[in-house]
């Protein structure tokens, strides 16, 4: 039993460490297609499997306090008990990371969008109608650059995901992008006339 628990812990811990490390590395490198594949493709599978492992461990090696009074408690060695606790802890870490990863993604998308808007969005007089003879017929260069750098990469990565996994990432990035744009407009006090 000890060997099986040890193998289970080593496997789930290695998979969890690899996935979390890759996700953070891809996001830091702004490699959004890879980030989305890992977090929206691989992470749900890891979460499902760690949940199943947690249920199996809890069913096979219940906590002494969780054992019904009519059943004799399973005697666990100290090492078995520690391994079970570590498996449950790793499963809980996967759960937490799964809940936090889109927030982390959204925050970085908003930061990246804000940087692009700060660097490229025209200010002041550019937006006054009197300086232009006609309305624009194509997107502004700043808008195209920001959309390609943020939204374009997410769309590229989302295409590789199953349909049901695309919506959360697309919703988060669109919201973050528009919030950054609105924050920039308000901070710079840009008036459209």
What residue ranges belong to the model's regions?
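Extended alpha-helical rod/solenoid/coiled-coil scaffold segments used as assembly/tethering elements
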Residues: 1-193
């Amino acid at each position: 039993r000890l060997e099986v628990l040890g193998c289970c812990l080593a496997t789930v811990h290695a998979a969890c460490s690899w996935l979390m490390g890759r996700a953070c590395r891809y996001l830091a490198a702004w490699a959004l297609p890879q980030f989305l594949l890992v977090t929206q493709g691989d992470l749900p599978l890891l979460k499902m499997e760690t949940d199943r492992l947690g249920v199996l461990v809890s069913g096979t090696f219940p906590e002494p306090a969780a054992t019904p009074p009519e059943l004799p408690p399973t005697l666990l060695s100290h090492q078995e008990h520690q391994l079970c606790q570590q498996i449950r802890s790793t499963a809980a870490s996967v759960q937490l990371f799964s809940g936090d990863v889109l927030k982390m993604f959204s925050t970085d998308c908003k930061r990246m969008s804000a940087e692009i808007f700060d660097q490229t969005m025209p200010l002041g007089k550019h937006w006054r109608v009197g300086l232009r003879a006609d309305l624009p017929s194509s997107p502004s260069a700043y808008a195209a650059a920001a959309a390609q750098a943020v939204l374009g990469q997410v769309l590229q990565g989302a295409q590789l995901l199953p349909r049901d996994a695309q919506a959360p990432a697309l919703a988060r990035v669109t919201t973050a992008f528009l919030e950054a744009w609105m924050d920039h407009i308000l901070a710079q006090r840009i008036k459209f006339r």
